[in-house]
Amino acid sequence: MIKVAISGYYGFKNFGDEAILSVLVNHLKTFENADITVFSSDIEYTEKTYGVKAVKRFNLKDVIKTIQNCDVLVSGGGSLLQDVTSLKSLIYYAFIIALGLLFNKKVIIFAQGIGPLNSNIAQNIVKNLLKYCSYVTVRDENSLKLLEKLGVKSELVCDPIYSLDIKSVPQNGVIGVQLREFKTMNFE
């Protein structure tokens, strides 16, 4: 049996993050003996929706116990390692990764968007953690270039959302569009 712990922005019912978790869990379930535990803000929702175990993401005792008992820690997808939202968010996800490394677990950074990393502290945190991870994949060229600049080896993969089984998504005739300003990107 392989025990996998998954860290990300899960249980907040953010469509993009939940879709990424769905793809990741479905892939892991193709391995016959996968025992999956997700760090979530809403344990009941995550367990019911994905058929996995879940622990409260801010329950330090449960998070540490889960990481100590897992074989692999997966961090991702989404854009978890960035300091635009807040440095606190980056520190939380970095702390989870650091625990995995501290307990000598295989740590996989899964299809993340890395950055922007505006502060030197954010750049140093990401650089000094990710270089020790077992496998780092990113979902876009900018993330690949940023990690290359920081001296972190990574691989470019497609965004996991493209693997989502859209047949399982309820069809109600509504299309949603989310507009977001990216101050660090020039689209001209």
Regions found by a protein language model. Give the residues of each.
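Active-site anion-handling motifs in enzyme catalytic cores
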Residues: 1-188
